[in-house]
């Protein structure tokens, strides 16, 4: 009696520990249960006739992983699909455009010096770029319809003047597209005024951001490795005190042009650090910081599909999953009690412990729960019930042979042991195959089912036995009719 109570107390301690884990550790919910965004990214080969190699895809995934981590979206996942696509899931993220801006850019950073005798051309292009930026400000500042009409007329005239200044032919494009065309033309011509350079983003060790002293805009700070610091010092030394500018080019676009003071003529800018200032907002500075920290993409990446799941749909999926799980458990409970009486009640306790242990493991590992994962959990409940059915049927067989209840229980467990082990091992082999060969949701299903297989073995062979022994230690419950109806009992026991 004391021994059975000791094992029962240990089991209750495990149950309490599992319960505390469940209430104190957060659960990770997947996209379909929590809501969020899913982006499909396609990796493009530099040569259209070339196939993308697996190591190239892995390199792209590694860079994107660092960028996603920099975004600070919790529980995000990035996986490959096929030979040239990746699926990014951002649970809880309802504005995928922010992630798209960061992930879709190559982030190839270059530091170049201006070509000789291009000062006047650079100033001309910078004036045009300033006018284009002013047009954007005018459009945003228009508030009432009357002023908007006046501004649109002025803007149309300015756009035509800029097209003439850049030598662009008349266009049938709308005003917005014409402004974009002018902006691209100006940028490409500015970039052409800089010499190629060997100093790139690959020479960086870190990037950060800080607010400028005027408190209205932000700047991005850079730290070079030793080789990069030497290159930067040499580059700035060569143009210090001249009218040649230092251009900072990101993905073929000049984001900043700066002059280098005469005081750096002797050694250049040393210290291995630099600052990019270009009227950044807090958000744009953060995006650039994330891109530079993640590194440049070895191959171009385009976003081919964006899917957003609202939080209400995720809540609805959780509600339906809970209803399905509770309904399944209720039907199992009715079946077990109807067929196995007291043993059925004990099995329900064991199944409740089984469910609690599962959820505690999900929180502890942690496992990201998705709808397929919930399906794997529900299926594993069926396996746990099946193990109890095997045990109780062996117990009933022993009772029909005329054995005592205690002896029948011990013999029933011994005889069912090998069958339970065999069934669980075969299922576990399937889970391992699905987990390593499958992708995405299939892995989630395999993970929860595999965890369920291990816990099912524990609850069937340990928890159920401890509970049966504990309840059978009370004489009032030690009745054969608690397992079999009177017409099922052998004659010597009726």
Swiss-Prot record:
* Biological process annotations from GO: intracellular protein transmembrane transport; protein targeting; protein transport by the Sec complex
Recorded topology in the membrane: Multi-pass membrane protein
Per the UniProt record, one Pfam family is: Sec_GG
Domain of life, per UniProt, equals: Bacteria
Keyword tags: Cell inner membrane, Cell membrane, Membrane, Protein transport, Translocation, Transmembrane, Transmembrane helix, Transport
The principal location of this protein is membrane
In this entry, which stretches build a coiled coil?
none
Name the PANTHER family on file. Answer: PROTEIN TRANSLOCASE SUBUNIT SECD, PROTEIN-EXPORT MEMBRANE PROTEIN SEC
Query: How does the annotation summarize its subunit structure?
Result: Forms a complex with SecF. Part of the essential Sec protein translocation apparatus which comprises SecA, SecYEG and auxiliary proteins SecDF. Other proteins may also be involved.
HAMAP family per the record? SecD_B
Family of this protein: Belongs to the SecD/SecF family. SecD subfamily.
Q: What is this protein called?
A: Protein translocase subunit SecD
- Native source species: Prochlorococcus marinus (strain SARG / CCMP1375 / SS120)
């Amino acid at each position: 009696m004391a021994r059975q109570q000791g094992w029962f107390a240990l089991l209750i301690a495990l149950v309490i520990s599992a319960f505390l884990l469940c209430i104190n550790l957060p659960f990770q919910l997947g996209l379909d249960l929590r809501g969020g965004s899913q982006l499909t990214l396609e990796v493009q080969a530099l040569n259209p006739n070339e196939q993308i190699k697996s190591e190239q895809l892995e390199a792209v995934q590694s860079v994107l992983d660092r960028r996603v981590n920099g975004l600070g979206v919790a529980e995000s996942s990035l996986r490959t699909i096929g030979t040239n696509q990746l699926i990014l899931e951002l649970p809880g993220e309802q504005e995928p455009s922010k992630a798209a801006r960061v992930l879709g850019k190559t982030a190839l950073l270059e530091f170049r010096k201006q070509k000789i005798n291009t000062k006047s051309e650079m100033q001309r292009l910078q004036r045009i770029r300033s006018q284009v930026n002013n047009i954007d400000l005018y459009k945003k500042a228009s508030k009432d319809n009357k002023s908007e009409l006046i501004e649109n007329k002025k803007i149309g005239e300015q756009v035509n003047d800029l097209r003439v200044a850049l030598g662009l032919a008349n266009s049938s494009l709308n005003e917005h597209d014409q402004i974009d065309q002018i902006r691209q033309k100006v940028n490409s011509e500015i970039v052409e005024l800089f010499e190629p350079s060997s100093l790139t983003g690959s020479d960086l060790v870190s990037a950060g951001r800080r607010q400028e002293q005027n408190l209205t805009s932000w700047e991005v700070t850079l730290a070079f490795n030793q080789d990069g610091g030497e290159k930067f010092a040499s580059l700035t030394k060569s143009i210090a005190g001249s009218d040649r500018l230092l251009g900072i080019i990101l993905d073929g676009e000049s984001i900043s042009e700066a002059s280098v003071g005469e005081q750096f003529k002797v050694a250049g800018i040393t210290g291995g650090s630099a600052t990019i200032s270009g009227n950044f907002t807090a958000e744009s500075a953060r995006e650039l910081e994330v891109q530079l920290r993640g590194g440049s993409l070895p191959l171009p990446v385009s976003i081919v599909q964006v899917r957003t799941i609202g939080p209400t749909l995720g809540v609805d999926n959780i509600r339906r999953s809970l209803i399905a799980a509770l309904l399944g458990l209720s039907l199992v409970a009715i079946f077990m009690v109807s067929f196995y009486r007291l043993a059925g009640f004990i099995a329900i306790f064991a199944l409740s412990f089984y469910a609690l242990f599962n959820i505690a493991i999900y929180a502890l590992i942690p496992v990201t729960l998705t709808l397929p994962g919930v399906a794997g959990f529900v299926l594993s409940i069926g396996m746990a019930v099946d193990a109890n059915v095997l045990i109780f049927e062996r117990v009933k067989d022993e009772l029909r042979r005329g054995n005592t209840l205690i002896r029948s229980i011990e013999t029933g467990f011994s005889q069912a042991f090998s069958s339970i082990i065999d069934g669980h091992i075969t299922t576990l082999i399937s889970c391992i195959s699905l987990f390593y060969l499958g992708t995405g949701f299939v892995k989630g299903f395999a993970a929860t089912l595999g965890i369920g297989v291990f816990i099912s073995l524990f609850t069937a062979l340990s928890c159920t036995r401890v509970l049966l022994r504990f309840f059978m230690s009370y004489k009032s419950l030690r009745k054969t009719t608690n397992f079999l109806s009177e017409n099922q009992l052998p004659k010597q026991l009726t």
